Swiss-Prot record:
Disruption phenotype: No visible phenotype under normal growth conditions. After treatment with the gyrase inhibitor ciprofloxacin (CIP), the usual increase in mitochondrial inverted repeat crossover products was significantly lower. No change in chloroplast DNA after CIP treatment.
GN (gene name): RECG1
Keywords: ATP-binding, Chloroplast, DNA damage, DNA recombination, DNA repair, DNA-binding, Helicase, Hydrolase, Isomerase, Mitochondrion, Nucleotide-binding, Plastid, Transit peptide
NCBIfam families with a match to the protein in the record: recG
Pfam families: DEAD, Helicase_C, RecG_dom3_C
Protein name from the UniProt record: ATP-dependent DNA helicase homolog RECG1, chloroplastic/mitochondrial
Organism from which the protein derives: Arabidopsis thaliana (Mouse-ear cress)
Length: 973
């Protein structure tokens, strides 16, 4: 410790800042002095323990007394500790400790999160296992720690002399030579090959510019020129952390500063621009007040003749109208004069404003009232330029209390410094689909010259959202394949779906035997569906497929054949139905077909597991599933219970998947099989099972007559493959749909049609929304309450009752009586909606039909028309307003058409979450129900890009953007 010397400067605390710190600490009280004393004590104690020097021991004693020492002694002591730590003063000591902590944090972060980017380096790709920087033997030497350098991205080195072209960075741009790849034959469609036409040097230069632009979008908002610290903090606190976040705050609408060019009618939603004539807060009573703002606007009068316009120059400019904007307040606190003064001062006389809302005409000519409106103040200079050029004016939504005008100004500044070449998507792709560049899209949506330009910019941003989702999905599928040939074949099958099938001769022996046991022949559409599913089952990746077809088209037997294909290969199959009645029906149907099979030495073992299965029998079934004794299990939610363990589950079929929640449908994915099972049903078509098969999640086949919007959205986006059965079995007679209002006249006509059908030997379902009468909803008809009424109305016919509260035996008995003809009228709830098969049922009556969804009504209609009789479906609405929605079902019996209607009404749901309705939060611009036609274009573009470069190495900027937009954790397993 003899080397430790305290200079006079250090003994004087080194700087004024040190003394001020001590003074502040002293002023804050004894608690802070104790904290500082403990901090110094720990530092000096470590040195004293290591050195055993008398000086450090004496200093340790002084530190113990720091909290009670005088101010000047505290100052001297701090300087001694700083010198002991080999620092000039306390400032130097604090800076060193801060640097050590930052370095420690960086090392830890880079070790745990290798995708973290330091400085302005090139983004690290998330889709490949890139080697660390330290493993490269020919790296440009820099004084920077190698552990913080980025990973090489693509071929070709940058010349160090040219690095000054890029933004200032933490380390040089790194690229890697890779001349081992040979040119390959292009399998893309005509016009889809584009990289072969571009020189390598040009691609590298373009990629460099794009990377610089991507770094610009990722820069912090406080780096924007001319933005004050206060404004940058406001933007950051409202979520605008980066330039990209700011540019993605899009206008909610555009104002046409030329105003309306049409006649104004009551109820129209219009946008006007005008000047405030008056703003007045009025106290109408002791507890009621309102604000009235009068705005003068100019519109062109279409009601005037051309002759009038030619004689009057003033008329050519249009006529003036007056908008009375009114907002009402109730409560005594809203009648105080200070409040009234404050609200009327928000809109000053002479302000230029943009108003949007619903108009209502007043008695005075050219005077209109608006009670629901949005009002935005415009700037005179902006208004004059926009009006002179006829440009639309963007109206931004406020966020976090920020003024829309302020947001508009900041966005305009960002557009001025936006790089010209910033598009990661190849120009050939945007050119083929007639889309603008990314720079033009940002400018076009924020500062459009015309509404058409704004619409084109919106299409480009929508295309980006769809394209990256499609590209991520296809890229992930390609990475699961090994060879280039396999990847080419997969892409070709996506281009030509007709190839996605196998011939019947390639089916397993068990599947072909089951097909022969059917008492009827499959339709061509059914055979095509089976071949397509079996093709998917033979692939080395888990299947995720939706089987869609109208009610009664034969989806169940197609699923049975898919299960036989899996069982014939030595694995297990699970079939989950939403109701116990349907599970029993499927079990009995499959059992009978297996008994009729011929030419099979050992038939598959089938089991039934529902909530009503006795405990002892349920335990035996679980043991047989775990051991592999049961090859095919049919049941309800019991199949996904935690107690259930499968020996070798290979396929999970979810029947009527719209009845299950997102979590329930996903639980099958957790039922991984760990070992191969030797089939108890016969010889396996394959003797060996690959190790990859032993850890792969089971295939999932979902079936639905009307897909819920979320499933339809996933199918359109490509995360679910779609198989559609378009044909119907021969002899199937279409069901007539009739709509009635639930008044006395309508009910009388319904009963008349029921009696006519019963006299001809038919059987009638009558479905109600509730079981018992409800006091909260007295207008709803109840099944149990209506039983007595219907029985008296049809005394010559027997009536039965079926609902969900009944015991399983009672429900089965009621259904069997109706099936056998013992009862001719069955009053029920929606428990019969799914899968109940009574061929002689010829009429379906749905009371209070507006209480059911479109999918439910389509399913209920499918319970009739399964035999040779002509069938009818009668939908009874409670009011006239409900008939409009019900008429949609009367116009079509196509499940996909009705699913699109449901999609339009409800939205596609949370794509990556658990919500079943609403709009996609991941896509701020796209609306699937409106912009769904662009999905196919995005899919084609993704196929073209991956066809030209399977690993996206030819498009490094695109790959980096994909890594940021669609990380693996979002794509799922």
């Amino acid at each position: 410790m003899a080397a430790v010397t305290l200079s006079p400067c250090s003994m004087c605390c080194g700087s004024r800042r040190l003394r001020s710190v001590i003074v502040i600490q002293a002023q804050r009280g004894n608690w802070n002095r104790i904290r500082l004393s403990n901090f110094f004590f720990s530092k000096v104690w470590n040195i004293s323990y290591r050195s055993k020097h008398k000086y450090s021991d004496n200093l340790l004693e002084q530190v113990e007394k720091y909290a009670s020492a005088r101010l000047e002694n505290q100052s001297k002591l701090i300087t001694k500790v700083a010198a002991l730590m080999e620092c000039d003063n306390v400032d130097d000591f604090i800076d060193k400790k801060s640097d050590e902590q930052v370095k420690k944090d960086l090392v830890l972060a880079c070790k745990r999160f290798p995708s973290i980017i330091l400085g302005d380096s090139r983004p690290v790709e998330l889709y490949s296992n890139s080697k660390s920087y330290g493993e490269s033997s020919s790296i440009l030497k820099t004084p920077t720690d190698n552990s913080f350098l980025p990973t090489p991205m693509h071929g070709g080195w940058f010349d160090p002399d040219n690095l000054s072209r890029t933004l200032s960075s933490f380390c040089p741009e790194l690229l890697q030579n890779d001349d081992s790849s040979d040119p390959r034959e292009d399998i893309l469609d005509d016009g889809s090959s584009f990289t072969s036409k571009t020189a390598t040097s040009e691609v590298e230069a373009t990629s460099d510019d794009v990377f610089a632009a991507q770094r610009f979008l990722a820069t912090s908002i406080d780096s924007m020129p001319g933005l004050s610290k206060r404004h940058s903090n406001q933007l950051d606190s409202c979520g605008f952390h980066t330039m990209k976040k700011l540019l993605h705050h899009f206008p909610r609408t555009y104002a046409d500063l030329q105003n309306a060019q049409v006649d104004i009618e009551d109820g129209q939603y219009l946008i006007f621009v005008g000047k405030v004539l008056s703003s007045k807060g009025v106290r109408a009573s002791s507890s009621f007040s309102f604000l009235e703002v009068i705005v003068s606007c100019e519109v062109s009068g279409r009601d005037r003749t051309p002759e009038d316009l030619s004689h009057n120059a003033e008329d050519k400019a249009g006529k003036s109208i007056f908008l009375h904007l009114k907002k009402f307040f109730r409560g005594t606190r809203f009648t105080w004069q200070p409040f009234l003064n404050s609200i009327q001062e928000k809109h000053k006389v002479g302000d230029l404003v943009c108003i949007s809302g619903k108009v209502k005409s007043l008695r005075a000519e050219d005077h209109f009232e608006m009670r629901e409106y949005n009002i935005d103040v415009l700037k005179d200079e902006e208004e004059s330029s926009h009006r002179a050029q006829g440009r639309p004016y963007p109206i931004y939504p406020s966020k976090g209390g920020l003024n829309p005008k302020f947001l508009s100004d900041v966005i305009s500044r960002a557009l001025r410094v936006l790089p010209a070449n910033m598009d990661p998507i190849p120009k050939e792709i945007t050119k083929v689909f007639g889309l603008p560049s990314l720079n033009d899209a940002y400018v076009g949506i924020h500062e459009p010259k015309t509404l058409d330009e704004a619409d084109l910019a919106r299409k480009r941003l929508i295309f980006d959202e769809f394209f990256y989702l499609q590209l991520a999905r296809l890229y992930q599928m390609l990475q699961s394949l090994g060879t280039k040939i396999e990847k080419d074949v997969l892409l070709e099958k996506f281009r030509k779906p007709v190839l996605n099938s196998v011939y019947i001769e390639e089916w397993s022996t068990l599947t072909k035997s089951f097909l022969k046991a059917l008492p009827y022949s499959l339709t061509p559409s059914q055979l095509s569906a089976v071949s397509e599913i079996i093709w998917d089952l033979k692939r080395p990746v888990p299947m995720n497929r939706l089987l869609q077809g109208d009610v009664g088209c034969g989806k169940t037997v197609v699923a049975f054949l898919a299960c036989m294909e899996v069982i014939g290969s030595g694995y297990q199959a699970a079939f989950m139905a939403p109701t116990e009645l349907l599970a029993i029906q499927h079990y009995e149907q499959c059992r009978d077909l297996l008994e009729n099979m011929e030419g099979v030495s050992s038939k598959p073992t089938i089991g039934l597991l529902t909530g009503s299965t006795p405990a002892k029998q349920s335990r035996m079934i679980r043991q047989d599933l775990q051991s592999g004794a049961i090859s095919f299990i049919i049941g309800t939610h019991s199949l996904i219970a935690e107690k259930i363990e499968y020996s070798a589950l290979r396929i999970a079929v979810v029947d009527e998947q719209q009845r299950f929640g997102v979590i329930q449908r996903g639980k099958f994915n957790s039922k991984l099989y760990g070992t191969s099972m030797i089939s108890k049903s016969g010889s396996s078509d394959s003797d060996d099972t690959s190790k990859a098969d032993l850890s792969m999640a089971p295939h999932v086949l979902a079936m639905s007559a009307t897909p819920i919007p979320r499933s339809l959205a996933l199918a359109l986006y490509g995360d679910i493959s779609l198989t559609q059965i378009t044909g119907m079995p021969l002899g199937r007679i279409p069901v007539e749909t009739h709509i009635f209002e639930g008044n006395e006249t309508g009910i009388k006509e319904v009963y008349s049609m029921m009696l006519e059908d019963l006299k001809s030997g038919g059987r009638v379902y009558v479905v109600y929304p509730v079981i018992d009468q409800s006091e909260q909803l007295p207008q709803l008809r109840a099944a149990s309450a209506e039983l007595e009424i219907v029985t008296k109305k049809f005394p010559k016919y027997n009536c039965g009752l079926l609902h969900g509260r009944m015991k399983s035996d009672d429900k089965e008995e009621a259904l069997n009586k109706f099936r056998s003809g013992e009862t001719q009228i069955l009053l029920s709830t929606q428990v019969i909606e799914i899968g109940v098969d009574v061929p002689d049922a010829s009429m379906m009556v749905v009371m209070n039909a507006e209480r059911f969804g479109i999918a439910q009504l389509h399913q209920l209609r499918g319970r009739v028309g399964r035999g040779t009789r002509k069938s009818k479906c009668l939908l009874v609405g409670s009011s006239t307003n409900s008939l409009k929605r019900l008429n949609m079902l009367g116009k079509s019996s196509d499940g996909f058409y009705l699913a699109n209607i449901d999609l339009l009404l409800r939205g596609p749901g949370d794509l990556l979450g658990k919500k079943q309705s609403g709009h996609l939060p991941e896509f701020p611009v796209a609306r699937l129900e409106i912009d769904g036609n662009m999905l196919q274009e995005a899919h084609i573009a993704a196929l073209n890009v991956l066809g030209d470069s399977h690993d996206l190495e030819k498009f490094p900027a695109l790959k980096a953007e994909l890594s940021m937009r669609q990380p693996l954790c979002l794509l799922g397993d």
